[in-house]
């Protein structure tokens, strides 16, 4: 799972970014259609579903869907490395784990484009510097606001933090419910999926893995 990092070419306006960060700019260079073309595609889907896009209740739906997609998939226009770029070195000798638990997120599965709803737990062992806690949550949000698999988003969060902050290790746990499993196919409402990725010390020291998992689980019993 550690290798599931989707690499995209760097943004044309960011060619000066260091090579070690280029892979995390993550804005694909695509032939993005116009808003009008996107709205026309929604109209086609409405017709394919069996409805009439010209009826009163659906006349504004294509425009609303396109506007919603700009928000739901806004992560393609954001850079995780930039969010993690500002760090603090005055940590008063703190050398233990930093853990941000229960970060809620909504994403969409890349197979059926239906929602994934879950929480992420992110921990890291600082190596002389820390990052603002809100930045961890923003990194989760950036990757969540793209078409995803749970395995990929788990590894991407860990990979971005490891490569930009260079901590001693990163631990990420993601728990989520997939609507592609709840609303269609086997239709198992309430089934959840759990994925983890460990880097550095968390990968080589089982005791650190165990402590991370214990600290995450302690929030349930407290």
Swiss-Prot record:
Assigned keywords, A-Z: GTP-binding, Hydrolase, Metal-binding, Nucleotide-binding, One-carbon metabolism, Zinc
Matches recorded under InterPro entries: GTP-CH-I_C/QueF (IPR043133), GTP-CH-I_N (IPR043134), GTP_CycHdrlase_I (IPR001474), GTP_CycHdrlase_I_CS (IPR018234), GTP_CycHdrlase_I_dom (IPR020602)
Binding-site list for Zn(2+): 109, 112, 180
MF (Gene Ontology): GTP binding; GTP cyclohydrolase I activity; zinc ion binding
Enzyme Commission number(s) from the entry: 3.5.4.16
PROSITE patterns associated with the record: GTP_CYCLOHYDROL_1_1, GTP_CYCLOHYDROL_1_2
Ribonucleoprotein recorded as keyword: no
Primary enzyme class: hydrolase
Keyword Transit peptide: no
Domain of life: Bacteria
Name recorded for this polypeptide: GTP cyclohydrolase 1
Gene name tied to this protein: folE
């Amino acid at each position: 799972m550690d290798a599931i990092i989707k690499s995209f070419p760097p943004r044309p306006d960011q060619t000066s970014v260091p090579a070690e960060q280029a892979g995390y700019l993550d804005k694909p260079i695509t032939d993005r259609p116009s808003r009008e073309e996107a709205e026309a595609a929604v109209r086609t889907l409405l017709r394919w579903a069996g409805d009439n896009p010209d009826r009163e209740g659906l006349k504004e739906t294509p425009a609303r869907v396109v506007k919603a997609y700009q928000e739901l998939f806004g992560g393609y226009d954001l850079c995780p490395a930039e969010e993690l770029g500002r760090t603090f070195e005055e940590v008063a000798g703190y050398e233990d784990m930093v853990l941000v638990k229960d970060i809620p997120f909504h994403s969409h599965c890349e197979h059926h484009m239906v929602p994934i709803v879950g929480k992420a737990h992110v921990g890291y062992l600082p190596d002389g510097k820390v990052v603002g806690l809100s930045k961890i949550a923003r990194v989760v949000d950036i990757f969540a606001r793209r078409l995803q698999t749970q395995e990929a988003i788990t590894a991407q969060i860990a990979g971005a933090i490891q490569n930009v902050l260079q901590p001693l290790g990163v631990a990420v746990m993601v728990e989520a419910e997939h609507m592609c499993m709840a609303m269609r196919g086997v239709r198992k409402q309430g089934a959840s999926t759990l994925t983890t990725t460990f880097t550095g010390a968390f990968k080589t020291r089982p005791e650190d893995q165990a402590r991370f998992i214990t600290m995450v689980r302690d929030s349930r019993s407290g």
